[in-house]
């Protein structure tokens, strides 16, 4: 696989993630766009690791996946608490983070 193709796909995924974060107001959609951006970075790590024949990129992918799993657990817990407290997951309506 050509490195430019992988770079283009990764760049497109990352761009779609940024656009989704800037346009959408649903907290779950924003969360999924952040995960899309992390997967774009993982694709880039794998592409460069395959291109250069170095396994370091694959190790970084493993660490990014571990961090993404922890982020998913914390992020979904926050979204569930947002819905339980005010019955909305719209980030515009839920802008005050008070105890």
Swiss-Prot record:
Subunit structure, as described in the record: NDH-1 is composed of 14 different subunits. Subunits NuoA, H, J, K, L, M, N constitute the membrane sector of the complex.
- Tell me which Pfam families the record gives: Oxidored_q2
* Matches recorded under HAMAP family: NDH1_NuoK
Molecular function (GO) terms listed? Answer: NADH:ubiquinone reductase (non-electrogenic) activity; quinone binding
Its EC top class is translocase
Which family does the UniProt entry place this protein in?
Belongs to the complex I subunit 4L family.
Gene Ontology terms: cellular component: NADH dehydrogenase complex; plasma membrane
Q: Which UniProt keywords apply?
A: Cell inner membrane, Cell membrane, Membrane, NAD, Quinone, Translocase, Transmembrane, Transmembrane helix, Transport, Ubiquinone
Quote the function comment for this protein.
Answer: NDH-1 shuttles electrons from NADH, via FMN and iron-sulfur (Fe-S) centers, to quinones in the respiratory chain. The immediate electron acceptor for the enzyme in this species is believed to be ubiquinone. Couples the redox reaction to proton translocation (for every two electrons transferred, four hydrogen ions are translocated across the cytoplasmic membrane), and thus conserves the redox energy in a proton gradient.
Q: What is its EC number?
A: 7.1.1.-
Regions crossing the membrane: 3-23, 28-48, 59-79
Localization of this protein? Cell inner membrane
Do the record's keywords include Coiled coil? no
This protein's membrane topology, according to the annotation, is: Multi-pass membrane protein
- Which reaction(s) are listed as its catalytic activity? a quinone + NADH + 5 H(+)(in) = a quinol + NAD(+) + 4 H(+)(out)
BP terms from Gene Ontology: ATP synthesis coupled electron transport
Q: What is this protein called?
A: NADH-quinone oxidoreductase subunit K
């Amino acid at each position: 696989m050509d490195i430019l193709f992988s770079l283009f796909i990764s760049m497109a995924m990352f761009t779609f993630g940024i656009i989704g974060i800037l346009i959408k107001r649903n907290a779950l959609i924003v969360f999924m766009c952040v995960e899309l951006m992390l997967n774009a970075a993982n694709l880039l790590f794998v592409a460069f690791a395959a291109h250069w024949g170095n396994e370091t990129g694959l190790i970084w992918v493993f660490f990014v996946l571990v961090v993404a799993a922890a982020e998913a657990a914390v992020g979904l817990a926050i979204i569930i608490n947002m819905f339980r407290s005010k019955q909305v997951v719209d980030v515009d309506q839920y802008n005050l983070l008070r105890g």
